[in-house]
C-alpha cells in the first residue's frame, strides 16, 4: 500500500512473482497482506502529502528520473509556469543526463539534471544551440555546483565545453569536496 507509483514495486507483488520458482522467498503472502491492509487504512491520513501521480508508471525507466524526484518534478515544473510543458521537461531530463555523460542520479546530482532540464525548456535551449544562446545566461545554482565539482567528480569526467559554458571564469575543484572542509574540532563540541 505504500509502494508502487514511482516507488519500488510492492513487496506483495515481488513475493507473488517469485512464488513456485527457485527464488521463492518463503514469505507467507497472507501474512504480508495484513501489513498491506494496515497501510492501506493509514495512507489516507497522509493524503495531503501525496503527489498527483495516482497510478504506477514505468516512465521513470524511460527518462531515468529517480522516483522521489519524479513525484516532485511536476509541481516544480508548474511553479515555473511550465506545467503545459511537463512532457518536454521529462524528455529534456533524459537529454541533459546524456549531455552530462549519463551520470549517477542521486540527490543532489538528480536535482542538477532536473534544474538544467527545466532551464533548457524555459529558455528554448537544445544541445545544439546552448553554446550560442546561453553564453551570457546565468545557469541554475545546482548545475553550477555540479560543474564546480562540489558534487564530486563524475565517472568519465565533465564534458569540458559545457563545463566552461556554465562556469564562465570560475575554476572547478579537482579533489573530493570533503577535503576542502576544515578539520572538525571534537574537543570544542
Region locations from a protein language model:
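Residues at structural and domain junctions
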Residues: 18-21, 25, 59, 79, ...
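Functional cores that coordinate and move charged inorganic groups
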Residues: 1-54
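Terminal or standalone catalytic/regulatory effector modules within metabolic enzymes
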Residues: 54-57, 64, 68-189
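A short, ordered amphipathic alpha-helix with a cationic face
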Residues: 3-5, 60-64
